[in-house]
Amino acid sequence: MFDNDRPQPEFVDPKIDKHTVVALGNDHIVTPIKMALSDHLKEEGYQVLDFGTYDNTRTHYPMYGKRVAEAVADGRADVGIVMCGTGIGISTAADKNEGIRAAMVGDVVQAKYAKRELNANVLGMGGIVLGRDFIFYIADAFLNEKYQPTEENKKLIKKIDNIAKPNPNQKDNEHFFDEENKKWAEGVYHD
């Protein structure tokens, strides 16, 4: 799995908080990987809220990023994990929600940094780019890392959080994506 010429990452010794609730969301491209991650997290003792999608029917990823982000922002979940093919689109969608610090990562070092230094509350990954086992490894590292507050990173986080502007038309609006869903059904969007 790893290039032997490079330093090997430490394997995480899970110290699971059995009360941690993880919200999951994905697009249709990575549903099997998300389902496997859900099973893995449950086996590790996490409570999982799965916001879909649940099959391989073509869908539009922003709505799933939004659902996960809202669950984290309103306290139904402690953290979120979102995935699409590359991780970029769904992570960006999640990050557009007030109170969310989403980090799209490609390795364990980035995942741990995002949690430890920036108190990221949504982890984004590319299911096709990374693959199932590496996703498990990254998710475990993120979930086991603890935020380590410093005066400097508290100031940075405050600045980041102040960027997000409340959008009353967006929050908890089940019809927010109606126009995009109609266009999707008409074939305007494609993979």
Which positions does each model-derived feature cover?
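C-terminal binding/interaction regions
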Residues: F2-H19, A23-T31, V108-D191
